[in-house]
């Protein structure tokens, strides 16, 4: 016999579904997050003039360099271009010794912090008559705002062969007729024999004066 009692049904879920967030509140939240990110970016410390110079020399001649580390070659160039090397108190040898002393044993580069340590070492030798702090400041002044000096620019070199080929006063034959005394080209007149159809004998100095004489006689 079938059970006449009805099975209890599950209570319907009366919890209302989550409504989508208020667009105005979402926009406000995104705006606040954006402002916070901008404030964080603005709060990032600016590079000092010394660190800017360090980065300029660090990337010099190396397209893959990041500017955060400096090779020994660029370190020597910085000391030379910024006149840290004076040839008396500080020499190229001194610069190389300090670099080897500061960098790690297995490293070939130095960081900005190590760079500052190296400058402190050189400052003692470069400005012996000043206190340690004053000497460091003087060395920093030599470097701040500086950039690598570009050298090895090709210059024009004069040679007898080049002079002979370019000096128009030494040209002969038909080539000589293509230039005037100042070396300026005559254009078409120097390349083509133009026919004189004026009726005057070549070399006649009074060409074109006949009409003036006739009018003057009237």
From Swiss-Prot:
Residues 1-45, 165-192 are annotated as: Disordered. The keyword Aminoacyl-tRNA synthetase does not apply. Residues 2-115 are annotated as: Mediates interaction with LIMK1. Its cofactor is Mg(2+). One of its GO terms (molecular function) is microtubule nucleator activity. Induction: Strongly up-regulated during the differentiation of primary oligodendrocyte cells. The modification Phosphoserine is found at residues 19, 31, 34, 106, 158-159. Residues 33-45 have a biased composition (Low complexity). It catalyses: GTP + H2O = GDP + phosphate + H(+). GO terms for cellular component: cytoplasm; cytosol; Golgi apparatus; microtubule; microtubule bundle; microtubule organizing center; mitochondrion; mitotic spindle. Predominantly expressed in mature oligodendrocytes. The modification Phosphothreonine is found at residues 15, 91. Zn(2+) binds at residues 60, 71, 79, 82. InterPro entries: EF-hand-dom_pair (IPR011992), TPP/p25 (IPR008907). Homodimer. Binds tubulin; binding is inhibited by GTP. Interacts with MAPK1. Interacts with GAPDH; the interaction is direct. Interacts with LIMK1 (via the PDZ domain); the interaction is direct. Interacts with LIMK2. Interacts with HDAC6; thereby inhibiting the tubulin deacetylase activity of HDAC6. Interacts with aggregated SNCA; may have a pro-aggregatory role in synucleinopathies. Interacts with DYNLL1. Interacts (via C-terminus) with S100A2, S100A6 and S100B; these interactions inhibit TPPP dimerization. Most of the protein is composed of disordered regions. Zinc-binding induces structural rearrangement by promoting molten globule state formation. Regulator of microtubule dynamics that plays a key role in myelination by promoting elongation of the myelin sheath. Acts as a microtubule nucleation factor in oligodendrocytes: specifically localizes to the postsynaptic Golgi apparatus region, also named Golgi outpost, and promotes microtubule nucleation, an important step for elongation of the myelin sheath. Required for both uniform polarized growth of distal microtubules as well as directing the branching of proximal processes. Shows magnesium-dependent GTPase activity; the role of the GTPase activity is unclear. This is Tubulin polymerization-promoting protein. It comes from Rattus norvegicus.
